[in-house]
Swiss-Prot record:
Superkingdom, taxonomy of origin: Bacteria
Residues the UniProt record annotates as site (Transition state stabilizer): 34, 133
Protein purpose: Involved in the biosynthesis of isopentenyl diphosphate (IPP) and dimethylallyl diphosphate (DMAPP), two major building blocks of isoprenoid compounds. Catalyzes the conversion of 4-diphosphocytidyl-2-C-methyl-D-erythritol 2-phosphate (CDP-ME2P) to 2-C-methyl-D-erythritol 2,4-cyclodiphosphate (ME-CPP) with a corresponding release of cytidine 5-monophosphate (CMP). Also converts 4-diphosphocytidyl-2-C-methyl-D-erythritol into 2-C-methyl-D-erythritol 3,4-cyclophosphate and CMP.
Protein family according to the UniProt entry: Belongs to the IspF family.
Pathway(s) where this gene product acts: Isoprenoid biosynthesis; isopentenyl diphosphate biosynthesis via DXP pathway; isopentenyl diphosphate from 1-deoxy-D-xylulose 5-phosphate: step 4/6
UniProt cross-references to Gene3D superfamilies, sorted A to Z: 2-C-methyl-D-erythritol 2,4-cyclodiphosphate synthase
Keyword Metal-binding set for record: yes
Transmembrane segments: none
Biological process annotations from GO: isopentenyl diphosphate biosynthetic process, methylerythritol 4-phosphate pathway; terpenoid biosynthetic process; ubiquinone biosynthetic process
Enzyme class: lyase
Designated name of the protein: 2-C-methyl-D-erythritol 2,4-cyclodiphosphate synthase
Length: 159
């Protein structure tokens, strides 16, 4: 078994909506990013890549490459997952923590879990997504952006 950890953060800027966990969430602000700014899927992709020792999302999909401008993070996750499977890994489980004062994530979490399970080809019982605030402390508490942490457990397929 191998464990990976991922972290991502994006500042608010421009107009909404935002995309988190693949879900379009109405909000007055957008997130500044080279891709679609999906902090949840970026952190999750990093966790999965880390567990497989395949580097990180920036190595695989560099923000200096115009091909990834405005990229759909679900597509990036699926491509990373294909590479991980090619190394002989299957999924144990993933756990994602979204850190944001606003907007409220709770109503959107069930759909996030559906999308992640679809993209990883796994059962929803293998996907957990939760959200928390920082009680108005720090940059997320001041409403300057959104952060996310994720962990992933991979299992090496037996031959």
């Amino acid at each position: 078994m191998r464990i990976g950890h991922g972290f991502d953060v994006h500042a608010f800027g421009g107009e909404g909506p935002i995309i988190i966990g693949g879900v379009r969430i109405p909000y007055e602000k957008g997130l500044l990013a080279h891709s679609d700014g999906d902090v949840a899927l970026h952190a999750l992709t990093d966790a999965l890549l880390g567990a497989a020792a395949l580097g990180d999302i920036g190595k695989l999909f560099p923000d200096t490459d115009p091909a990834f401008k405005g990229a759909d993070s679900r597509e990036l996750l699926r491509e990373a997952w294909r590479r991980i499977q090619a190394k002989g890994y299957t999924l144990g489980n993933v756990d994602v923590t979204i850190i944001a004062q606003a907007p409220k994530m709770l109503p959107h979490i069930p759909q996030m879990r559906v999308f992640i399970a679809e993209d990883l080809g796994c059962h929803m019982d293998d996907v957990n997504v939760k959200a928390t605030t920082t009680e108005k402390l720090g940059f997320t508490g001041r409403g300057e952006g959104i952060a996310c942490e994720a962990v992933a457990l991979l299992i090496k397929a037996t031959k």
